[in-house]
Each structure stands twice: as structure tokens, then as C-alpha cells.
Amino acid sequence: MPLDGVYDRLTDVGYAYGPAFQGLRRVWRGDGEIYAEVALPEEQRADAGRYILHPALLDAALHPLLPGVADQDRAALLPFAWSGVTIHATGASVLRVRLTLTGSDVAALTVADATGAPVASVESLLLRPLSKDALRQAASTARDGLFRIAWNTLPTTDTPTDTTDTTGWAVVGDLTVDGASRHADLGAVANADSVPDTVLYAPPVPDGDVPEAAHAALRDALSTTQSWLADDRTTDTTLVVVTRGALATREGQHTDPVQAGLWGLLRVAQTENPGRIALLDTDTDTIPTTALTTDEPQLALRDNTFHTPRLARTTDQPTDRPRWDRGTVLITGATGALGTVLARHLVTQHGTRHLLLLSRRGTNAPGAQELQQELTALGATVTITACDAADRHALTSVLDDIPAEHPLTAVVHTAGVLDDTVLADLTAERLEKVLRPKVDAAWNLHELTKDHDLEAFVLYSSIAGLIGNAGQANYAAGNTFLDALAQHRRALGLPAVSLAWGLWAQASTISGQLDQTDLRRLARLGLLPLSSADAMDLFDAAPATGEAVLAATRLDLGTLRKQGAH
């Protein structure tokens, strides 16, 4: 039987298996019997001898019983009771399996190794049915897949003291630090007779409208950071980049999205160049001499108190959930993989009846017309329009055409592109390419809809901006801009949430560029893929947290603890 895409299909109905558990190799169907060959991945086979029967291999042996594998109409079933279990051999890494169906919910199991030698037999395996809704509820990550960014007060034992010697410090920019030498620019620091141990640098804040200023600030930061990191004279000097009010450390604080973008870019610089750069966001131009006597790479100073960012569990708050079944819902990037998943979800689960789907190619995008037909058949009125939301005039025209009888009530911005490379090789052109659909489009959506009575304004951000994923300085910068924009809107009393997505199992413009090496690297970092079903559970659960910025991801907390991650 064909197995192409079988685990993607299983993921979509709630069975999310990681690479180690995707063991099905071949399946045959006979009269009342199913035959299968299952195997451990190469990297897992060395562990087979540690088990009587490797758990991933045993699990894979039952995968032919899952919905849509050997039987398209099979209901979701779970193993409930085993009887008559006999073990003949241990340590197998490849199995040949015969499943004999003795009833609608009973099967016998015979297992051999690759040579045909007996491994195990099960006289009776009792299965229990499980509805798809129950399966999704059981598999849902909504309770443990949403994380807020908590700015924790620095513990007293780690709080800097007032005895800091600043004679080895230098200042560049609009800052005041007692005892530190002042230089015109970072080049002057590198050219000094004695290069300081620590340099506090306040990047200039460009004039112009917000998107223009954000682009200019990030171009300047990219060039400055590249020059600093490439200069052998500064390899032993810590560069502390100081922003002012870029981020919100608590609900209701105003942010500066222009400076917030710097945090995304520089978090990647930190990842790629450990120990070279620190980040400090302040509410004052006068920096206490205690600011850098801690090992924390990222700090916020508020009212003379230091705070450090951590991911923390969310809790539900008494807040209204958005109504997706009234008015028109606008989705950007709507014909991409993530936008398509969302559009289907809103129509089938929330009763959305008027969708305005924007993408650069409109109905010429692959699958766009089929999506329109599918959602129309479900009772929705679907308009797919070719529009680059970063083009303010084009977006204005589209918004003006929304009929008054179905006014705009929600915006979801999913658009984005990747152009990954290490920071040292990143060019201004590649930076601009990635920023445009994030910064320009999101700001246009904000400004052009801020006077509408919106139920929801959702930004699809990325955890890359929060953790500084190596090779994604441009993408991280665009996404921390989105996070700050959500906080900016909330401070204005407008609806907004920025979802910093982790890895999706669903193939997309973003995840589709990841090979198996990338996926294993992310797994080692503790990032696991989200099924489309789980991602939509998180989408639905996000408003109840009351947070403006959320990391929406599956995390392997055991892996994170082993790494000493926070």
C-alpha cells in the first residue's frame, strides 16, 4: 500500500510522531490480515540491544491500525489490553509484522526479525475506539505549548554592586556612564591606544516613518555589528548595545518597534558569536555602573531594577475571545501553507463566512483556486486577491473594497519569506527582502485598520526572534518588530497578539527549507514540530492568556534542562 505522506496525514488528525517513531516501511493488506515491515532509523539502531523490544519499533508495528494507513475508513483506536504475550528474541532493529483482525476491536500480533526468526507474539490485543475530537483533545498542546515572555527581577544574589570599576569602559552614543571614556564611534574605540574591556553603544534612531526608520536602523546595525565582529582588535571587548524603551517588560508599556528589531538581529549575533555582545534596554539615558557586573546576556533596566527575560507558562485570564463568525476576516500570505491551514480552520471550526485572502499571486498561486472552491462549498464567501500588503496604496485599495454589510472585523498577518545566512555574510539587500513582508506589511495593516472595530489583530511571528536562531538575523529582526508592534497596539488599547511560532510539521515556505540535519539540530535545541491541529489549538487558546506576545511551540523540556537553558 502507498505510504507517501502517511505520517503527515496522521499528524493532521492528531497522531504527531517524531522522526524516531516514523518506522513504517511497507504495508500489505490481505483478507482479515495486515502485513508490515517496520524499522528503526539508522541513528537509533545502536540502541536496539538495550531493550527487549525497542518502544519506537513496537509502536510502529501497530501503525497499520491507525486511521488511513491500511484502512481509509478505520476509526481512531488505541491499545487497551494485551494478553498472551510471548517474547522469543530481543534486540531487533527491523521487524516483519502480521496483524490478524479477529474482530472490529481485537487483533493478534506475530512479529519476526528481518531474517524471519520469531521475535514476539500477542494472542489478543484489545483496542478501544477514540473519537477524532477526543484524540485532538488528548493530543492538544494548548495547555503546555504557549509561553509568555516574563521579565523576572534579577535575584538579589545576582544583583550588581556599586563598586564597579569603569576605567576600562567606553561609551558611544547618547549615553552617560560615570567614569567611562567617550568616543565618537566604534571605529574610534578600535583605534584607541588601549582598547577598553567594555563598550556601551547606543545606536542612532533614524528619522522617518516607522518602516523607513526600522529599515535604516537595521541596515546600520548590520553594518556596524559586522565591522565590530570582524575586527581582531576588539575580540576581547564586550559590546553592550543599549536601546531605550524598545521592549515592554510588563503589560501596557509602550514600545519602540524600530529599536525592537535590533534585538532580533543582535540575539542572532549573540548566538553566532558567544560572549561578544550583550543587550540592555533601559528607561533612562544614564546607565548605572552596576549594569554589567552580571553574566546575563540580555537585561532590561526599569526604575533602577534589573530584569531578565525567561519563557514562562501562561495562565488563562478573564478575557473575551474573538468572534470569527462576524464580518470579514482578512488573512495575508493566505495561499501559503500556514495561511491555508488557518483559512480552513476558521471556516470549519469557527463558522467564518466572509474571508478576504491576500497573497502576492492571488488566484494564480498554486492551490488557490482549489482552496476557494473548497471553502465556498463549506458555505463561506471567499475572495482571493493579488495584493502585496507591504504596498500601502494597493492595500488601501483592497480595504476600501470591503462591502459595508460585511465590515472588516479581524486581521491575521501570516506573510513572510526567508533568506538565511550567517550574519557575517548577510547583505543589506537580503535584509530588506525579509523585512519588507514583516515590517512594512504589518505596519500598513496596523495603520490602515486601527480605526476599525476589530475583534482580533494577529501577527504570525517566529521564535527565531526570541531565541536568536543562528543564520536568521534578518528574519529574527522582522519578527521582533512584530512582537513590539503587538505590544504597541495593546498599549494604545487596540487588540493584538503576536504568535512567535516554533517549528511546524506542515510543509511550508519556511519549514520546507529545513533538511533532516536542520530538524535534528532543532531537536537537540529542544524544539519539536507542531502538527497543524495542535497549532490551531494554540491559535484558539492564545486570546485567553491575555498576553500580547506568546511563543507557540512544542518544547522538549528535558532537553532544555540538560542544556541548562532558561
Question: At which residue positions do the language-model features occur?
Answer:
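N-terminal flanking helix/linker immediately upstream of nucleotide/cofactor-binding cores
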Residues: Q317-T319
